[in-house]
Amino acid sequence: MKLIIVSGRSGSGKSTALHVLEDMGYYCIDNLPIGLLSPLTQEVLDQGKTQNQQLAVSIDARNLYRDLSDFPSIYAALQAHNIDVEIIYLDANDATLIKRFHATRRKHPLSSKSTSLKEAIAKEKQLLEPIATLANLYIDTSDLSIYQLRDQVKIRVIGHKTQELALLFQSFGFKHGVPSDSDMVFDVRCLPNPYWDTALRGYKGTDQEIIEFLKQHPEPEQMLQHIISFLETWIPHFQNSNRTYMTISIGCTGGQHRSVYICERLGEHFKKKYDNVQVRHKELAQ
């Protein structure tokens, strides 16, 4: 049987991820106590379900600390019974989680009169560490919309299931920080910058005006071909090491022009070679 465990801090998008899995045909259980994980899977096996049975559960920090600490041994026991276990761990930066709780006016499950929201979020990270360290898939949802998160979960789960590589090319601005989910980072700040042309400053890297500007210079094409050559050489090696997804980040100063252009070109190229290719522009989504 196939078991997907969805975990992560409150407000990171676990419910959304579980809904995606339900739409994909998984039988889903929300907020399962860790102590019931082994009995549940055993019950499914005892009922004579087929090996194609797909089960997904979410686990959060409301479990007892002792149970969370025991998770690695429970995980190992499930694998010993030939259960195909996959862990999806969702997270976001503290500022984003705080903003989401303020927006929804929900109470954090670990907050109390003596524990502030900020303290509860920090405590939750510590409690979930035994699960986070074993995660097969880590998704940072800080800058993702609900729809982008749904796409991320779907493409990564499908890729993991079929052993088909899923590629995400994302542009970003270094002044906003390097995305924490990056597997590779390419710095394109050395390329000619249309920002300094006041007539072009308001355009984005997907606009024809910026495309034409960058095509007028030899450096962007040269940089692009070098990145393509590097990726075509090394992506197969990552595939051979059982990687089923990769996040390749392209950064310029503000994430508006050069990185967007290069990212789009990379997406166009690799969509001809791989079925699961996504392009995302982190700063344009703001």
UniProtKB/Swiss-Prot annotation:
Binding-site residues for ATP, renumbered to this chain: G8, R9, S10, G11, S12, G13, K14, S15
Signal peptide start and end residues: none
Family matches, as InterPro entries: P-loop_NTPase, RapZ-like, RapZ-like_N, RapZ_C
Keywords, ordered alphabetically: ATP-binding, GTP-binding, Nucleotide-binding
Disulphide bond pairs: none
GO MF term list: ATP binding; GTP binding
Binding site for GTP: D60, A61, R62, N63
Job description of the protein: Displays ATPase and GTPase activities.
Cross-referenced PANTHER family: RNASE ADAPTER PROTEIN RAPZ
NCBIfam families: PRK05416.1
Name of this chain's protein: Nucleotide-binding protein HCH_05324
